[in-house]
Swiss-Prot record:
Family matches, as SUPFAM superfamilies: Ribosomal protein L22
HAMAP family cross-referenced by the UniProt entry: Ribosomal_uL22_B
InterPro entries listed in its UniProt record: Ribosomal_uL22 (IPR001063), Ribosomal_uL22_bac/chlpt-type (IPR005727), Ribosomal_uL22_bac/org-type (IPR047867), Ribosomal_uL22_CS (IPR018260), Ribosomal_uL22_sf (IPR036394)
CC terms in the record's Gene Ontology section: chloroplast; large ribosomal subunit
Organism for this UniProt entry: Illicium oligandrum (Star anise)
Protein name: Large ribosomal subunit protein uL22c
Protein family according to the UniProt entry: Belongs to the universal ribosomal protein uL22 family.
Pfam family of the protein (one): Ribosomal_L22
Record GO biological process: translation
Domain of life: Eukaryota
A GO molecular-function annotation: rRNA binding
Amino acid sequence: MIKGKSRTEVKALAQYICMSAHKARRVIDQIRGRSYEQTLMILELMPYRASYHIFKLVYSAAANASHNKGLNEADSFISKAEVNGGVIVKKCKPRARGRSYPIKRPTCHITIVLNKRSNLTKK
């Protein structure tokens, strides 16, 4: 049986963030399953560069929830948070004696899904 999306599920997606997926996952693992307010407090205090991008994405997902679905941000929690690897931007850096060194800039795609706390089904 295929389940349909719940009406209270809100998604935000950030693509081509110039950072490796491994570094972004280290921050995402800390906020998965937490409430909206608790997530914002954690992300403000984390010293990692990825926390700024994830903070903006969580804030955007909450704005989507309140504007599009009319949900309250205080009742929402992060039901799904994932980081996938994106394309690798390849460049060449010129070096001495006509040589060149490759530069690889990894990118990642971050997905945040907010859900309403009262819709959490207990099994």
